[in-house]
């Protein structure tokens, strides 16, 4: 796995509007569905990443423990041609298997 520099947006940065497919129910999820007054946790994850796999159970626990205080959403932006295990169908399988309490978007 290549080391890629990434940076965090400043806390309090307004999230841009977006629409992506929720792989679990095949519905379009809009950022406008979020509760406007609560903080949001937007996670960029994928099925094949060993770092994410290591935290699967913790993500589920965190989302369950804080579901009344935070809006959670996970987004995969991977290239499914190069990473077929990150396809929407596989994302749905994983979300159901792990019991995600949050939308898993592609």
Residue ranges, per PLM feature:
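Short, hinge-like loop/turn segments at secondary-structure boundaries
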Residues: 36, 89-93
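Loop/turn elements at helix/coil->beta-strand transitions in domains of secreted/extracellular proteins
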Residues: 38-39, 68-71, 99-102
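Typically the conserved alpha-helix immediately C-terminal to a functionally engaged Cys/Sec
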Residues: 51-67, 85-90
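Short, internal strand/loop/helix patches
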Residues: 92-106
């Amino acid at each position: 796995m290549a080391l890629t520099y990434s940076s965090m947006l400043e806390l309090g940065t307004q999230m841009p509007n977006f629409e992506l497919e929720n792989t679990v129910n095949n519905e379009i999820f809009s950022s406008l569905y979020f509760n406007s007054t609560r903080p949001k946790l937007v996670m960029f994850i994928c099925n094949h990443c060993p770092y994410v796999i290591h935290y699967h159970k913790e993500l589920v626990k965190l989302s369950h423990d804080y579901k009344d205080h935070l809006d959670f959403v996970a987004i995969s932006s991977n290239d499914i041609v190069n990473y077929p295990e990150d396809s929407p169908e596989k994302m749905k399988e994983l979300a159901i298997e792990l019991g995600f309490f949050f939308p898993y978007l592609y």
